[in-house]
């Protein structure tokens, strides 16, 4: 029996994608081979690779000024790869910290140059909001400004992207990429690990503006130098072939759903249902300011935290799994990515209401 999986990542996948991958496991397209067995330079995999790139560019409306790269290392790896690619000319970068992931980025970049905390969304209740542009204190001519546009742990999402003029904006969009349309032209660099909305763990998508390919540090490994990867069409080293194949299936699934505008409407409906349930109750609490609440990652706390394990056990018995909050913040977290159906969220809120009534 399939469960409703609320994991933050690796996360729920579209069942249609899983079934197609299963059907093609031993023989992709009449080739007599699994995708796992293909040469990454063979015509079969090159077809998969090019279709994935084309479909992703179409879904996100990526302009011709930007390259799409398939890399390895995950979002966490990009915390080092970004400064090594952008600090070659200016060894200073600014950071807007809105949660745990941008904190990690801020700390990692200190190994490669001077970093400046331009703004923080931390309050007495933890990370609960996104500082407005007027609150940012930018340094003089930084190499880039880094922003995590969706904080997976704290459930904080950035919806308003400021115009920084000539300063490149770097966005870690790992946990909400493909959940809604985005104006890619506003970003110098946008990256995301695959294991949320793109597919399975193993491939990292990096979208980088052409003019930023000439700014790498000499210490940057060639396998992670964006210019080298771009010139070689993400084939400089052996790419994560099966992860790219799965991502390609997800892209086609998204197109069949109506693209990102249609997906956004579904995600708004799911998030509203869950947040309304939390807000209408004195038994559950979400601490994030309403205009910064993530549509993808919804953390919440029980008024009586001694009942956390009972809540999780009861949820699991209902087929509602992976609801435990991150160890650094506790409580619960429901990650409701694209592949989590509305029926799953309805089942969760029904259980939440019943659990509250039993404890009343």
From Swiss-Prot:
| Record: residues binding pyridoxal 5'-phosphate | 101, 152, 172, 195, 237-238
Highest taxon, organism lineage? Bacteria
Which keywords describe this protein according to UniProt?
Answer: Amino-acid biosynthesis, Aminotransferase, Cytoplasm, Pyridoxal phosphate, Pyridoxine biosynthesis, Serine biosynthesis, Transferase
Cofactor note as given: Binds 1 pyridoxal phosphate per subunit.
SUPFAM superfamilies according to UniProt: PLP-dependent transferases
Function text: Catalyzes the reversible conversion of 3-phosphohydroxypyruvate to phosphoserine and of 3-hydroxy-2-oxo-4-phosphonooxybutanoate to phosphohydroxythreonine.
The annotated subunit structure for this chain is:
Homodimer.
Descriptive protein name: Phosphoserine aminotransferase
Q: Which gene encodes it?
A: serC
